[in-house]
Structures are given as structure tokens and as C-alpha cells.
């Protein structure tokens, strides 16, 4: 599984902290420390604070340089992402198969969601140029009986304070085809409620902006599926695996049967040898009788 990479938060400019105005005499007395050497301790504390300011400065510089490296490699990856998308387009139902095979995404998919996702042709994740301010996820669809849109987009933004927000394309549902409404009605009839993390329909996610910071689906798509979708498309069929195990068991049973047959044959051979010995003994007794 590809390692998850989180977009760094915006950098906060840190002001150097002034040396702490500690009542050292009072502190020393309350801690039971001797007053001797208080001046040296005060100087040490001031120097520690100066060193800490330098550490903070380096941490800030480190974050800025990491962002530059990320920006560089994002540009280098783009041609390969484009080539991968072109190849994926040659495989029917690649997108819906990938989502269905992913354990977290599949739990959000209803039957009608899967039907609509069969028209999905491409998914793309695009980070904003500065990276730290957010990214966009685009879903491309063929002509279908569910909605008019050819592209759905959902954007995630981080402001200067690091607070997340999101916005998305409005889905133009065709008459009577809004799967989010039907899903909601079905759940009301069954008197069931889902948590925020599990919307009634996969497509409800596009209109849910209530808590962008707790959006698990966008993290899964961006940090898990997008880096390497092939690993989920190629998930082996569990039925095939179980069938293979049954075949192995049958082979083992067959081997055991052959061993039992071999044991029986060996037993028959032993009995045959004993019969020959008995016959030889009887012949010997008859010969002795004739001599007499």
C-alpha cells in the first residue's frame, strides 16, 4: 500500500520569544534549591530560550524547503499521471472496480451508486500550485441516465490559519434519477440512521461540507487510491481463492486414499507369504510320514 502523504499546513510565522521573566529567587526557594548559583541558572535559562528560537527558525526553514521539493516533484509526476490516465481509459469499469474493491469506499456504495459509477471514466487529484493551500478531486463521466454533468469536482482548501473548508460541483440529476433522495427515503422507512462518516449515498459526499477536517473519503481517494489505483483494481477474487483451497484439500484427500490402498496391498502381500510358509510346513510333515 502506498504511504499516505498529508499536505502540510500553512506556515505560521513565529516571533522570537522574549526571555522568560521568572522570579528565580521565588522559584528556587519554593523548589528548595540553594540560592547560590541563581545567577548562573538565570543565564542558562536565557541561553536555552535563545537556542530554542534558533531551533524554531530552522523548523520553519525546513518546512519551506520541503514545500519546494514537493512542488518540484509534483511537476515531474504530471506526465506519468497523464500517461496512466490514458492507459486506464482502455480498461472498461476500471474506476468502479477500484472503488468496489477498496474496503473503506465499498462500505459507502449502494447498489444504485455502483450502477452510476459504471459510467466513471477517470479520477484525477490536482494539488494547488503552492500545495499548502489545498487540492481538487475531479470525477469524469460518460453520458449516462443519471445526471447531466460530465465532470464533478470537489475542492479542499486550507486558509492561512490552517482551517479546512470544501466546495463542490452541483450535481444536475436527471428527472427521477437522484440516488441520494431515494437512498434517504429508503433509510427513513427502515428507521436507520448513519453517522456523518457514512453518507446515505456515495454522491451525498459531493454536497456534504459540514466538516471538511473530518472527511475520510477525500483522504482515502487522495492519499491511498490516487497514488496507485492498480493495487485495488487487481485485488484477487476471494471466491477464486477459496476454490483453490478446496482443490488443494481434494488433492490431499486423494493422496491419503492412495496411501491407504498401498497399505492394504502390502497387507495382502504379507498374508500371501504366510500362506506359502504354511503350505511348505504341511509338505514337510507329509514327507516325514512317507519315510516312516
Curated annotation (Swiss-Prot):
| Coiled-coil intervals, chain numbering | 35-78
> Family per UniProt?
Belongs to the nucleosome assembly protein (NAP) family.
One family name in Pfam for this protein: NAP
Taxonomic placement: Eukaryota, Metazoa, Chordata, Craniata, Vertebrata
Stated name of the protein: Protein SETSIP
- Biased region (Low complexity) positions are 1-11
Q: What does this protein do?
A: Plays a role as a transcriptional activator involved in the early stage of somatic cell reprogramming. Promotes the differentiation of protein-induced pluripotent stem (PiPS) cells into endothelial cells and the formation of vascular-like tubes (in vitro). Involved in the transcription induction of vascular endothelial-cadherin (VE-cadherin) expression. Associates to the VE-cadherin gene promoter.
Q: Where in the cell is it found?
A: Cytoplasm; Nucleus
GO term, biological process aspect, one: nucleosome assembly
GO CC aspect terms: chromatin; cytoplasm; lipid droplet; nucleoplasm; nucleus
